[in-house]
Swiss-Prot record:
Transmembrane segment boundaries: 34-54, 78-99, 114-134, 179-199, 227-247, 289-309, 321-341, 348-368
Subcellular location: Mitochondrion inner membrane
Family: Belongs to the cytochrome b family.
Gene name in the database record: MT-CYB
Gene3D superfamilies: Cytochrome Bc1 Complex, Chain C (1.20.810.10)
Binding of heme b b562, residues: 84, 183
Gene Ontology biological process terms from the UniProt entry: mitochondrial electron transport, ubiquinol to cytochrome c
Name of this protein: Cytochrome b
Protein keywords: Electron transport, Heme, Iron, Membrane, Metal-binding, Mitochondrion, Mitochondrion inner membrane, Respiratory chain, Transmembrane, Transmembrane helix, Transport, Ubiquinone
Positions annotated to bind a ubiquinone: 202
Gene Ontology terms, MF aspect: metal ion binding; ubiquinol-cytochrome-c reductase activity
Other comment: Heme 1 (or BL or b562) is low-potential and absorbs at about 562 nm, and heme 2 (or BH or b566) is high-potential and absorbs at about 566 nm.
Amino acid sequence: MALNLRKNHQILKVINNALIDLPAPSNISTWWNFGSLLGICLITQIVTGLLLAMHYTADTNLAFSSVAHMCRDVQFGWLIRNLHANGASFFFICIYLHIGRGLYYGSYLNKETWNVGVILLLTLMATAFVGYVLPWGQMSFWGATVITNLFSAIPYIGQTLVEWAWGGFSVDNPTLTRFFALHFLLPFVIVGLTLVHLTFLHETGSNNPLGIPSDCDKIPFHPYYTIKDILGFALMLSLLVSLALFAPNLLGDPENFTPANPLVTPPHIKPEWYFLFAYAILRSIPNKLGGVLALAASILVLFLTPLLHTSKLRSMTFRPLSQILFWTLVANVLILTWVGSQPVEHPFIIIGQLASLSYFTIILILFPLAAALENKLLKL
């Protein structure tokens, strides 16, 4: 009998074990689609980014013009740019939903997978930040100035560190060139980390909505979840293309249509929408170092979630108190996102401070307490 090439070929069997014959729980819902959607986002961003890089010039005198040239003179350049810019938004929508799914269903108890995932989030944020600087518009320049300047809050080495990162005494040509180099490099780091993420995931297998072991009831990934994933791809890509064609600048900042000018500060410096929740936390603390620490903590707190899990049940499916807290946290993050987009004045300052406080309180204090209380109520 001839050997089955798919199962015996050194390379094909790796693909087979990851995408075809992978045993998957029979009851995973649409919330488990976001991993593969993130994969599609990554591929889309790398392809469109490569095409953009072919026409882009990383020089302060030419960057803005090269982007304008792309949109005017390159065949479908406007489409490639709009897909790349809005693809970043979809990437973050998917990753936030993916993390939310992980928090709700207790997926963070696969500790290695979760920790690599948090590192992936940090790398994605770094990539998006350096990428936003490249068009060299007003918000690109001032965003880069404000955010890199935060490193100067680090005691003793801060100022030296910032000047080393800038390659001078302000954001200028060396900064732009190195940011372009980093923006080109980091997506490939993300690809590598994604493979590590999947390797750890396939050691334990997927979690499921009930949060119970599903070894007794597995189905092959292909055809069941390949078809399900393709439906997700079609929905997401149709939304992305619709946004890129009908409202390409909806999520952008109008300031970025003005070339960077170090002598004119925009009235409201703010990052892209997907960083606003963290930006609101940063602004809520009236001290530079404190703000930077809170900003870092807002993401790094995810590393602590596996350690803070006190419930005897893995998932929140049967834990109503934790569910209430979870959806309160979601609302809280949305409030932070909104506050981050508002100017720093009376009602927004206090709202931001309260939302920042409740963000950390829910994750660090209320989640473990509610879980312990539920154990008691359920006599577990």
